[in-house]
């Protein structure tokens, strides 16, 4: 079979021009490090404000992953409980496809798996170095707990240490009995009740509403949580009891991650690692910056916390710690024992 050569018709010349131009553009522009794929957007949520450390993490991750993938993957972040999804409900919300993922404070997730209560056990961790090591040792356990629910761990955020915001100073254990306090998980509610306080576990936005209605006079949270919510409008004392150095966990649905091409998956992993690193670096100055803002807004930071107050709270913390040990794996208990030896 013989083929006739192409005639130099006007249409043929146009084809050649288009082809030549396309080749030139490809050579000039070059190929992106991540091949283009169908645009994807992950809807992510947190119950905390954008300026809170949880919100900062979502912002950092979103910007980094968008940059890494040349805008092919972006995040749509909902802050300050905009979607009415508390940390306790967040795993289920992702499974139900209301969100793709988010950043959840870990303590309330204990209702899904007890391992998530590790970082907020009372007085278990007393330094950032210990908190970082505990998070690293527990990471495979967090990953496993999420994986069984079709979810993937992205990064861990370590929070500033927990204290008590109150309308009156806490000078002795008797002052604890006068508190109507919001706590951030079931264990902390049990501890506060054991010292005589009226305690209720609530998402922070619900607690602030009750604070405005004078149904609460204290909130258990970090300086970071309080600054982001401007708790100084109602509570003028902060006692840094160092109750815990807790974490929040950022995650996404595994099927969303699996739908990405391998190159994009690698960039997501890189963005998550970079976010976790930058979140930890924030802690170096975060507490000092928070305290400066608190003092400038009339908050008395009553440090050091009275030893008798700490002793009463530590004694009350023994029961929830024992209960937690009874329902977790040997691997989890080993992490707790290690932390106790490195106070």
Each language-model region and where it sits:
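N-terminal secretory signal peptides that target proteins for export/translocation
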Residues: 1-14
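C-terminal segment of classical bacterial N-terminal signal peptides
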Residues: 19-20, 25-35
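An acidic, glycine-rich surface segment that forms the CoA-thioester-binding/catalytic face
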Residues: 136
């Amino acid at each position: 079979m013989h083929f006739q050569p192409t005639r130099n018709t006007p249409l043929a010349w146009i084809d050649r021009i288009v082809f030549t131009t396309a080749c030139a553009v490809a050579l000039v522009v070059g190929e992106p490090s991540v091949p283009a794929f169908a645009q994807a957007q992950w809807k992510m949520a947190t119950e905390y404000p954008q300026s809170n450390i949880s919100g900062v993490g979502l912002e950092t991750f979103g910007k980094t992953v968008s940059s890494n993938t040349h805008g092919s993957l972006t995040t749509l972040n909902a802050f300050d409980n905009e979607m009415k999804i508390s940390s306790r409900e967040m795993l289920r919300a992702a499974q139900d496809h209301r969100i793709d993922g988010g950043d959840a404070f870990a303590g309330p997730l204990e209702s899904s798996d007890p391992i998530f209560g590790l970082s907020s056990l009372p007085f278990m961790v007393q330094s950032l170095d210990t908190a970082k090591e505990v998070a690293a040792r527990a990471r495979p356990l967090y990953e496993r707990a999420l994986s069984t629910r079709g979810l993937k761990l992205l990064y861990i955020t370590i929070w500033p240490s927990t204290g008590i915001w109150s309308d009156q100073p806490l000078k002795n254990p008797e002052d604890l009995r006068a508190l109507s306090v919001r706590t951030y998980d079931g264990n902390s509610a049990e501890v506060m009740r054991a010292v005589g306080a009226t305690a209720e576990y609530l998402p922070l936005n619900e607690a602030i509403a009750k604070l405005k209605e004078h149904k609460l006079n204290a909130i258990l949270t970090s300086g970071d949580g309080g600054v982001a919510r401007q708790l100084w409008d109602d509570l003028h004392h902060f006692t840094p009891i160092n109750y815990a150095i807790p974490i929040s966990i950022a995650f996404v649905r595994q099927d969303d991650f699996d739908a990405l091409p391998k190159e994009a998956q690698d960039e997501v992993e890189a963005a998550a690692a970079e976010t976790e690193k930058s979140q930890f670096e924030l802690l170096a100055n975060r507490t000092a910056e928070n305290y400066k803002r608190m003092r400038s807004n009339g908050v008395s930071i009553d440090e050091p916390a009275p030893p008798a107050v700490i002793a009463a709270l530590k004694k009350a913390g023994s029961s929830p710690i024992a209960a937690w040990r009874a329902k977790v794996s040997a691997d989890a208990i080993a992490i707790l024992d290690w932390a106790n030896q490195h106070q």
